[in-house]
Amino acid sequence: MYIPSARTAIVQDDKGGLKIDRNAPMPQPRPNELLVQVKAVAINPCDHKMYERFPTPGAVDGCDFAGIVVQLGSDVKTFQIGDRVCGAVHGSNPSRPESGTFAEYTVSDGEFTLKLPPNLSFREAMGLGTTGLSTIGMAIYKGLMLPGSPLEPAEKPRTVLVHGASSSVGTMALQLIRLMGHIPIATCSPRNFELVKKYGAEEVFDYNDPECGQQIKQYTGNTLAYIIDPFTDVKSVALCYEAMGRAGGRYACLEMYPEFALERRSIKVFFALGMALLGHSLDLAYGYERDEDPEMRSFGIGWYKVLQELLYQGKLRPHPLRELEGGFEGILKGVQMVKNKEVSGQKLVVSLE
């Protein structure tokens, strides 16, 4: 199969933003990696946060992708050229600037790449939010330490609060928690109540209501012990801690937490950083840095095997999509829309076919 020597990609510029590079270098897959021709991408908050927090001119942005395998690393045994796949990588990575997904081609670790079933299109696969699936797996098992598996549900259900559940991360968390045999409850804006219930929430609360925390506490009988918080700002931490039961519990956040989050000793805080699931060291800062972690990598490989089986069984329903036209120009527009908080209850997807 012909592979060009260069590709079009969206890279960081030297002014703290993004630009389209029509002559970006073609990445070479390492022994355990795949080279994928990208057919669709999804846009995540991390796609603007990475270049804002960790400026690296020339680094390719983007984390989620779906496409076709065009080249195999020397150690890859479980994929073939032509396989339809999806996955997530560390975009705008200072340690590997060529690795983002907003490009005609990207590289992906074979252990963290999912094969698409025939009935799932590239666009629909992006509704799964593969970056979010990585993060939620870490939050559920390493942060909340919930028993059970989506393939072998727990015998005794726990109630789990998913704060801000109308995002793709939220709807995937709701489904996975249900599959594990637990009871998800949720917060979101009232306009998304029905959406969140369709994805498995037992009860939903308005996170803009000043009494939201107390309402959750009353609903759970002051016994709530498990919370996932994608926002992790001062307001969300305060709400989640108000909702937490008298005895405390486990709080898994998806952003770096403010210092006061550690003041309530009965609450165990865990920062679930999805890009750390691969077990590689992260040359970042501000609490996002990580040492190499073979145990986390082993866990991540096992989690992706579970996700692959769930895909084959058709047990994960993609988040509602909003497709943007314009290819790479559409991606730039979408990143700005997410940055400006113009998206609610939908996953922005751009086709590159």
From Swiss-Prot:
One term of GO molecular function: oxidoreductase activity, acting on NAD(P)H
UniProt keyword Protein biosynthesis present: no
Cysteines paired by S-S bonds: none
Gene3D superfamilies in the record: Medium-chain alcohol dehydrogenases, catalytic domain, NAD(P)-binding Rossmann-like Domain
Record: residues binding substrate: 131-138, 274-278
Induction (UniProt): Expressed exclusively during fungal penetration of host leaves, the time point at which plant defense reactions are triggered.
Name of the protein: Trans-enoyl reductase RAP2
EC id: 1.-.-.-
Cited PANTHER family: HYPOTHETICAL OXIDOREDUCTASE (EUROFUNG), TRANS-ENOYL REDUCTASE STHE
Signal peptide: none
Function field: Trans-enoyl reductase; part of the gene cluster that mediates the biosynthesis of a tyrosine-derived cytochalasan acting as a fungal signal recognized by resistant rice plants and leads to avirulence in Pi33 resistant rice cultivars. The first step in the pathway is catalyzed by the hybrid PKS-NRPS ACE1, assisted by the enoyl reductase RAP1, that are responsible for fusion of the tyrosine precursor and the polyketide backbone.
Self-association and partners: Monomer.
Repeat as UniProt keyword: no
Pathway: Secondary metabolite biosynthesis
Keywords recorded for this protein, A-Z: NADP, Nucleotide-binding, Oxidoreductase
Gene deletion effect: Does not impeair avirulence in Pi33 resistant rice cultivars.
Entries under InterPro entries matching the protein: ADH-like_C, ADH-like_N, GroES-like_sf, NAD(P)-bd_dom_sf, PKS_ER, Trans-enoyl_RdTase-like
